[in-house]
Amino acid sequence: MTNKTWGGRFKKSLDSSVNQFNASLSFDHVLFDQDINGSQVHVKQLAKQKILTEAECQGIYSALEEIRTEIKQGQYSFNERDEEDIHMFIEQLLIQKIGDLGKKLHTGRSRNDQVALDLRLYTRDKGCLINELLTRLIDCLDDLTSKHQQDLMPGYTHLQQAQPVALGAYFNAYQCMFGRDKSRLDDWFKRMNYSPLGAGALAGSTLPLDREWVAESLGFAGIIPNTLDAVSDRDFVIELCSVAAMIMMHLSRLCEDLILWSTQEFNFVILDDAFATGSSLMPNKKNPDVPELIRGKSGRVYGHLMAILTVMKGLPLAYNKDMQEDKEGLFDTINTIIACLQMITPFLQSLTFNTLLMKTKAQSGYLDATAILESLVMKGMPFRNAHHQVGAWIAEAIEKQCSLNELLKGG
């Protein structure tokens, strides 16, 4: 008979290569805090429902708290262990501490609803942190919007000079984009904040569990009523990865502009020494590594989103082992976006904007062409005729190497 917790019907031990291939402890150990929180509320529920005694509940609860402290203190290694995942790891530690009483922890529970709970608690915690960091970025952009309301710069389409805009309007555009991202994150939170615990493997439990009490105790808005749905979907993971990809896309576009602006050709932005790097060969270099890395990291977040979508696309109800593949991409997505959001705000605050040069560039060239066109329209000229006329003037001004205003005044 195998020594696995599920090994009652098995006559052979699990092949060591299968055990290694099957294991997720090396990466899902980050869920230990959420796993213990869920287990402590679960065991309280078992006592409340008279399935365990109060003394049994207290013994399990206290031992779990000891395990939490020991893990935080670094007393355990998560590599080269026999336990398959963080859930079994904690349960085995519990049994080592309090004997057979520890074997009662899993009463009325499956790892299917347990891991679904842990993931919801984890993504909720990290989602709140992402929201907080996003709010800081939006506030920073609001400050830059106010500071640069009157500072003119060239606006671009197709990366060609188009019309004058305020530098403050530029920052406000990104403030609006990240504001919508925050709204998406808020909407995600409302949808995901429901408890799967009590769904069991897929069909609930015959024990008199109080799912609503557990949900309330863990800070959820309610329960996921359909037990099949509760354990079988990872749409909340996909949606968070999707929102993260959207945020990273906006960060990448912002960083692309700042990278261009920091070149000698633009010279709109001066990088702070504390947020730039040099070259191992060229002593003249001052490199924008921070925005380049943020721009680059958007690719890995996109990749994780496509990976989890692909994992989930062909799975029959309910739980399948494929769903173990949801975690590494999710964890890396969360770590990546947190790191980028923690970096972008102080980076923006460190920049010096060459507003005098921006204004000069905005007032040179032919950025006033659209305003002149519309002034002709206001005098009664048909739009297409006005467009053609201003285009002809621009061609003449280019030939004479003068501005549009100089040409018109001279005429």
Curated annotation (Swiss-Prot):
Gene that this polypeptide is encoded by: argH
One of the GO biological process terms: L-arginine biosynthetic process
GO molecular function terms attached to this record: argininosuccinate lyase activity
Pfam families in the record: ASL_C2, Lyase_1
Upper classification of the organism: Bacteria, Pseudomonadati, Pseudomonadota, Gammaproteobacteria, Legionellales
Source organism, top-level taxon: Bacteria
NCBIfam families the record matches: argH
Catalyzed chemical reaction(s): 2-(N(omega)-L-arginino)succinate = fumarate + L-arginine
UniProt family annotation: Belongs to the lyase 1 family. Argininosuccinate lyase subfamily.
InterPro entries in the cross-refs: Arg_succ_lyase_C (IPR029419), Argininosuccinate_lyase (IPR009049), Fumarase/histidase_N (IPR024083), Fumarate_lyase_CS (IPR020557), Fumarate_lyase_fam (IPR000362), Fumarate_lyase_N (IPR022761), L-Aspartase-like (IPR008948)
This protein's UniProt keywords: Amino-acid biosynthesis, Arginine biosynthesis, Cytoplasm, Lyase
Subcellular location field: Cytoplasm
Official protein name in the record: Argininosuccinate lyase
GO cellular component annotations of the record: cytosol
Major place of residence: cytoplasm
Keyword Cytoplasm: yes
